[in-house]
Every structure is written in C-alpha cells, then in structure tokens.
Regions:
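C-terminal regulatory/interaction regions
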Residues: 249-270
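Conserved, mostly hydrophobic/aromatic
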Residues: 9, 29, 41, 105, ...
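Short acidic/histidine-rich active-site segments
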Residues: 42, 155, 222-238, 258-261
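Domain-core and long-helix interface of multi-subunit machines
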Residues: 14-16, 100-101, 107-220
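An N-terminally biased module of ancient metal coordination in phosphate/nucleic-acid-related enzymes
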Residues: 1-90, 94-101, 161-173, 197, ...
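A short helix->loop->beta-strand "cap" motif at the edges of active sites that frequently abuts
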Residues: 34, 73-75, 189-191, 222-223
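Short acidic/polar active-site loop segments enriched in Thr and Asp
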Residues: 35-36, 103, 150, 223, ...
C-alpha cells in the first residue's frame, strides 16, 4: 500500500464527458485519504468555439478555486487544464493559457487533424489502425515541438480503442524508433511522462504507456513521471494508482512529480 497518493488527471462535469462536481470529487478524495489531486478539464483546441470550451474552462477554474478553499488543510487541490491538440492552433492555445494561472498543463492528442476523437470511431482494420497510430505519433512530436505544457498525457491513447472496437493489438516494435524519439524529446524538454490508468478500466486492461515504455523513458534521460487516473467519475479517483506506481518503480523511478505554479516538485514513491 502506497502512502503518498497523488492523482494528477481528474475531470469534473465541466468536461463534456465528466460526471461529478469538483466539490463532490474532493469529498471522495478526503474520504479515501488522497493526498493531492489536480483537476484538468478538457479544452480541445480544434473544437474550442464549436464546443464552447471558453465557458467550460471558466466554470472549471472557478469551481476548482472554491474546492481549494473548502478543502484547504485536508486535500491539496491543484488547478490544471488538459489541452487537446494545442499545436493545431498554437495562437489560440497560447491565448487560453494566458487567461488564467494554472498549476499544471497537460498536453494530449485525442484525434488527428480534421478527424474524430478515436473514442468516437466505430471500427478499425489492421491497416487503418497502423496508419492512424503512425500519424498519431507524428502529432505527439508536433505537440512536443510546440511545448507549452508540463505533462505528456496517455501516450499510446489510440491503442485502447483499436482493441475495444476491433480487437486489434498493435505491434509496438514497429514504432520503437519513433517512440524513442518522443521519449527523448520529452526528457530533453523537461516534461513529465504521465502513467495513465484509464486503460485498466477498459477492455485493453493496460496502462498508457505500459511499463516497458516508462522504463525506456528513464533510460533516455527522463526525470519526471506522474500518475493520472483520468477519472471522469468520482468512484474512479486514484483507480490504478498501485499498478502505476509499481510500473514507475520497476522502471527505476524512486520519485514521482506534482506541479505547483507549473513548477515540478519531486516526491518519494512510498
């Protein structure tokens, strides 16, 4: 049983797919003795105006601020945001970040350009899945080149949907060179690699990324790792934390990271 329980990827009902308020989730955090959590509601840059993310992120920010005040001394509550596809419109992404002060910014890719989120796609073939995944990795590199974020979220995100919708398992060895390029750039830019446990609650039953990728990140000079449950329900808060911490320790990390005012702080994994 780990004592330093920190979940840095949690969504409220201000995310389109979220289900509970920040206050309700913090009540759950206090009951389960979670030490800290970061709320990181979605802000998909390529559908910012269409899906009214301006209103969503404003509501999220102020509701989290209220939760910070209410739970001060009980749970460390951090202000975050998950920027989806920020490099598709860098000017807008920078404008969003300039509006408010965040403790952490998660960078993610949920969809390729002018396509749906992988979550909404109906099915895949071996050929299409490999094509999508190769292009996804290219977009991750683009995200890193843009660079104004702190945590690289759920690397290998599409794999969970290739499997759940079409039973396809990607041979990761085909992409080892490109994944190494991503991990090396993540390390060089001082970004944290998130170990995301959402896949453990889905048919694929795997972390994103898996332990071997986390280990490779360490080998390539990675310093910062974070845990994110990617909870969209209060009951999923910190779910999979033990498996994620185990993967970090197996990879050679003795410390995990949390961010305050976008500054990384190392904490022992214990």
């Amino acid at each position: 049983m780990y004592k330093r329980t920190v979940d840095l990827h949690v969504h409220t009902d201000n995310s389109p797919d979220g289900n509970h308020s920040a206050m309700f989730i913090c009540e759950k955090a206090e009951l389960t003795e979670l030490r800290a959590l970061a709320f990181c509601d979605h802000c998909e840059i390529d559908s910012f105006y269409q899906d009214k993310y301006d209103k969503r992120i404003r509501s999220s920010y102020y509701e989290v601020a209220m939760a910070q005040s209410a739970f001060r001394g009980k749970v460390l509550v951090l202000e975050g945001i998950e920027l989806g596809q920020p490099h598709y419109d860098p000017e807008l992404a920078e404008k969003v970040l300039a509006m408010r002060e965040y403790d952490q910014v998660i960078g993610s890719v949920h969809n390729l350009r002018n396509t749906q989120d992988f979550y909404y796609m109906d099915s895949f073939t071996e050929e299409s899945a490999n094509d999508y995944f190769n292009r996804y990795l290219d977009e991750i590199l683009g995200l890193l080149e843009w660079g104004n974020f702190d945590i690289l979220a759920h690397l290998t995100y599409p794999l969970r949907y290739f499997y759940s919708k079409s039973g396809i398992i990607i041979d990761m060895s085909r992409y080892s060179k490109k994944v190494d390029e991503i991990l090396k750039l993540t390390a060089e830019k001082g970004k944290a690699l998130e170990v995301n446990s959402a896949g453990l609650r889905q048919p694929i039953k795997k972390l994103a990324p898996e332990a071997d990728v986390v280990k490779r990140f360490k080998e390539l000079g990675g310093k910062y790792v974070t845990f994110g449950s990617d909870a969209h329900f209060a009951e999923d808060l910190a779910a999979g934390l033990t498996e994620a911490y185990d993967a970090m320790k197996a990879a050679g990390f003795n410390e995990m990271t949390l961010f305050q005012q976008r500054t990384p702080l190392l904490m022992p994994i214990e």
